[in-house]
Amino acid sequence: MNAKLLSREVNKGTGAPVIGVFAPCDPRIDQASRERSINIVKSAAQKLASKIKQPDGKAVDIVYSDILIDAESQADQVARQFKEAGVNILVCVPDTWSFPQLTTLSLMAHFPKDTPINFTTGNSAPRPGVVYTHATAGAIAQFGKLTHINVGKWPDTGQAPEMDDQTLENLVDWCYAAITFIGLRGRRVVVFGHDSMGMETALAHVLETRNQFGLEITRLDMKLLSDMLQKESYDKEELKKLRSWLEGHAKDRIELPELEKDSELLDKSLALYLIVRDLMVELDAVGGGFMSQLEWGSDSRAIQQPVADIMESLFNSTFDHN
C-alpha cells in the first residue's frame, strides 16, 4: 500500500467550532422518560442552532445524537458520531440520573482533555438530571479537569419540555466562550516590542498562554516596523484612500499644529496601521500588542516615530476604509 500525498488545498471549515449535544440515561428507566430525554436533546440543539454565530455572521455547526448514552457502547458510538462531524465542544443536557463512568466519562475519553464541556440541566424532575450533573462534574474534577454547570429550569412533566429563557441565555453565553477558546487554539497574536511600564499586565506570558489557551505569541522587534516605515513598505495608493476616508469623517476634528510636519506624522500613523495589518495577515494572527512608549515616539536621542493611537483605534473597530 502506498502512502497518500495530501492536497495543498485545505477545507476552510477544518478545525472550526462544532458543538455536539447529547444526554446520558439509565437503561432501567421507563420508555416515556427516555423519549422525553431525546426531545430535550433535540430542543436544546435547535435552540443553539438559532443563536450561535461566528464573528463573520456564519452559523456555528450544531449537531446532536438521539442515541441516549446508557453505557460504554453508546458512549463510544456517540463519540464516533461526534468525531466524524468534527465536534470539539460538548453540551450535555441530562434529565435523568445515570452512572458517570459508564456515560459521559467514557465519551470524554475520545476527546482531548481540554475539550470544553457544559452540563445544562433542570433543577428537579422525577429522576433528577441535576444529581447526575453534580456527580459527573465531581468525577471529572478528580482527574484534573474543570467543567461548567448550568443548573436551570425546564418543566418537570410533559414529553417535550423547553428550557426557560434564562437557562438558554446562560448556555448561549457559555457556548460563545467555548467557540472563542476553540477558535483561538492554534492561532497567534503578535507582540511588538517590550514593556516599559514595568507592569505585570504588560508582560507576555508565552508558556502559560500556550498551555492554557493553545495560543502562540509571536514576538517581533520594533526595528522591523521602523525599517518598514522608512522603506515605505506599504501600498501608497491605499494610504491615500485611508487618509481621504479619515478626513471625510473627521476633517474638522483633526488638529495639525505644525501643518507639514504633523501631516507627515499623520500619514505615518496611518501607514503604520497598514504595515501591521499586513504583517498580521501574513502571520495569520488574530490579535496583537504594541509597545508605544518612550523610545518609539518621544525619546529625543532617536528618530521620532508616529503615535500608534490611530492604529489601535482602527484595530479595535469593526470597520476601516475598506
Where are these regions (language model features)?
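An N-terminal assembly and electron-transfer interface module characteristic of large anaerobic redox
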Residues: 1-322
